Amino acid sequence: VKSTNLMAFVATKMLERQEDLDTCTEMQVEKMKTSTKARLRTESSFAPRTWEDAIKDEILRRSVDTSSLDKWPELKQELENVSDALKADSLWLPMKSLSLYSKVSNQELSSIPIGEMKHQILTRLKLICSRLEKLDLNLSKAVLGIQNSEDLILIIYNRDVCKNTILMIKSLCNSLI
């Protein structure tokens, strides 16, 4: 999700400055935009978002001035790093992929006012919780069509994990309030 947000943000900012781009770069940016929109559609089954949502999330994450691209070299490098990390990820290493994307420095955190950071954390936790509830609902619907006992056990286990995670997130939200 983070890399999708970054790609959407960069593509949008680059296309706003179309007059500064040569034809080849413009075509690459358009290709990146098309690819990012395809990724948003793929992600939408887990986390329904629009192109605008992805850009807003990246702006919020970075707290950047959207009228300038002063940080373009840093953005480009981070985009390349995330892109390389995505190529190396596999579905079986979710913790590895989480650690790759959680590169928030203490300086970035200290620059966010405490109340605002708390609000951002609560908002994201509530969003995660609602998506987990949707996943739990989808898993409960999936149980109806299962004919294999191994798949049934796996779904029941995943529902339990999902419910326990929801409870932990709700408890965390209550402790932050």
From Swiss-Prot:
A motif (Nuclear export signal) lies at residues 91-100, 117-127. It holds the Pfam family Flu_C_NS2. Signal peptide: none annotated. It is found in: Virion; Host nucleus. Mediates the nuclear export of encapsidated genomic RNAs (ribonucleoproteins, RNPs). Acts as an adapter between viral RNPs complexes and the nuclear export machinery of the cell. Possesses no intrinsic RNA-binding activity, but includes a C-terminal M1-binding domain. This domain is believed to allow recognition of RNPs to which the M1 protein is bound. Binds M1 protein. May interact with human nucleoporins and exportin XPO1/CRM1. This is Nuclear export protein.
